[in-house]
């Protein structure tokens, strides 16, 4: 199958939901060819787990419901638990968002599902799985997609057994691997070597769901599809770049898992570094998967390993005046080891040592139990030279808000309306909910799973890209693991440690605190 376009064409007249998906189906290899192509079997490894229940099955249902999958697609769940399809359906129902009018379609979806129980390290279990797949329509000719919704501790056994017992005989086989892709550079390289000994790179889909988000995918179009940004997207005009990921909740019972990884491994080394590479990379020769990923690797190679002096680490503590979970600090979570020094907040400053970005700080900020839910890219531009307005002008900023409420807006100066002759801050605003009211933005997993069906790897992580990401962070992570520095406490629901604000101010980010956003829908 060919590569699909990453976005549906938008006409001047808003499209209905059915029209949107009709347009998308046309882009999937001219609709008919894609939908009536070979039989596909999608196998969910770890079908009894939370990821499968909350994300994978719902995503497959939405794609099936909207007619975006090939017509002859079947689904097989595999896990150690003794389950039935009815049991899986019952556990998934709260997350499927199925309406009463979709009941018949939902029944058809689950009629395409089957389930096999087995052990991940047991060859006989996978031989049995293969026998079951061969009984489905398409038999040995069906294409197979394996989604590893599993802990990384079983990747080795599962992938080896897939290779030896479950590869499609006459169709293609693709394997989707969830993060974490290792714990540091060495473990990541070992995993990559293991996978490459079993599969070719075009069979491996390392999924970072952030690469499926609307505004992350929009970064390339915004940069390379608009003439106005090219001349200013460099060190001559950009003072600094801030990449932010904030969550308003803590670990809430997931402390055991989180404590093994921490916020840097969980968010910064993958999600935020992916954003950085899309902001900083050079223009690719085309939008082909390898051309795009080649440029991302090139820019990552220009970043030196992070040093501790460019990092602030924090850990949230309870707010005595808060409500519910806000009263509890990280160490109050019963699943967290006593006295843990794991970071729930981090700010780091990176520099891209190339002609375009030399000297421009890239500030990565992420944390849990903060004052809001927000993920965004913010380019702050340099001051206007030769100021004639008596220091009343603030720096321009271009902001790409990834979540919530996708938007692109530019902070700029304009004359204050009325008899005044002085500048004030305002914005050029493209809020998606206002501009594209009738467009259903697909979930990140919908986009990415559809990409796997189509064979597009643009929004998946390649092995050399992964290697460079770990090279940048591993020395810092090893130092933190060895020295266990005490993280700076910050109150649940706050902005994070004040020391982080001091760091970003020191490297050149300017926070004026004077800007007031006005919702255009409430004027």
Residue ranges and their predicted role:
Residues 2-177, 181-523:
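Secretory/organelle targeting and membrane-embedding segments
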């Amino acid at each position: 199958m060919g590569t699909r376009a990453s976005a549906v064409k938008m006409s001047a007249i808003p499209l209905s939901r059915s029209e949107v998906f009709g347009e998308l189906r046309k882009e999937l290899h001219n609709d008919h060819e894609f939908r009536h192509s070979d039989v596909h079997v999608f196998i969910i490894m770890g079908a009894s787990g939370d990821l499968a229940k909350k994300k994978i099955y719902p995503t497959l249902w939405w794609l099936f419901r909207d007619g975006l999958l090939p017509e002859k697609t079947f689904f097989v769940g595999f896990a150690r638990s003794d389950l039935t399809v009815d049991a899986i359906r019952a556990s998934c129902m709260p997350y499927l968002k199925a309406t009463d009018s979709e009941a018949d379609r939902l029944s058809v979806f689950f009629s395409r599902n089957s389930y096999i129980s087995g052990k991940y390290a047991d060859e006989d279990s996978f031989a049995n799985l293969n026998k079951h797949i061969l009984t489905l329509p398409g038999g040995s000719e069906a294409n197979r997609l394996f989604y590893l919704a599993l802990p990384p501790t079983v990747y080795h056994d599962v992938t080896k057994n897939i290779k030896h017992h479950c590869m499609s005989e006459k169709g293609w086989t693709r394997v989707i691997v969830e993060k974490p892709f290792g714990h540091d550079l060495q473990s990541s390289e070992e995993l990559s070597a293991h996978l490459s000994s079993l599969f070719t790179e075009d069979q491996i889909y390392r999924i970072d769901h952030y690469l499926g988000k609307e505004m992350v995918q929009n970064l390339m179009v915004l940069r390379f599809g608009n003439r106005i940004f090219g001349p200013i997207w460099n060190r001559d005009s950009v003072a600094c770049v801030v990449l932010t990921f904030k969550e308003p909740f803590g670990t809430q019972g997931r402390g055991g898992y989180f404590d093994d990884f921490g916020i840097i491994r969980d968010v910064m080394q993958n999600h935020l570094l992916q954003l950085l590479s899309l902001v900083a990379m050079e223009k690719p020769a085309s939008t082909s998967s390898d051309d795009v990923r080649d440029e991302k690797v090139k820019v990552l190679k220009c970043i030196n390993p992070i040093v501790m002096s460019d990092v602030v680490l924090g850990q949230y503590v309870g707010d005595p005046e808060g409500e519910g979970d806000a009263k509890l600090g990280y160490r109050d979570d019963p699943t967290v080891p006593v006295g843990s020094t794991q970071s729930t907040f981090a700010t780091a400053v990176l520099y891209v040592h190339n002609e375009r970005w030399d000297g421009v700080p890239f500030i990565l900020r992420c944390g849990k139990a903060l004052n809001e839910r927000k993920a965004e890219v913010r380019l702050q531009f340099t001051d206007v030279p030769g100021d004639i307005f008596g220091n009343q002008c603030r720096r321009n900023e271009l902001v790409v808000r990834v979540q919530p409420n996708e938007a692109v807006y530019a902070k700029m100066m304009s004359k204050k309306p009325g008899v005044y002759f002085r500048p004030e801050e305002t914005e050029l605003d493209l809020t998606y909910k206002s501009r594209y009211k009738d467009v259903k933005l697909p979930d990140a997993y919908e986009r990415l799973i559809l990409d796997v069906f189509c064979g597009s790897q643009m929004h998946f992580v390649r092995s050399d890209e992964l290697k460079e990401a770990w090279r940048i962070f591993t020395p810092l992570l090893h130092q933190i693991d060895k020295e266990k520095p005490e993280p700076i406490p910050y109150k649940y629901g706050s902005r994070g440690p004040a020391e982080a604000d001091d760091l970003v101010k020191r490297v050149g980010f300017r926070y004026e605190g004077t800007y007031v956003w006005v919702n255009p829908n409430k004027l």
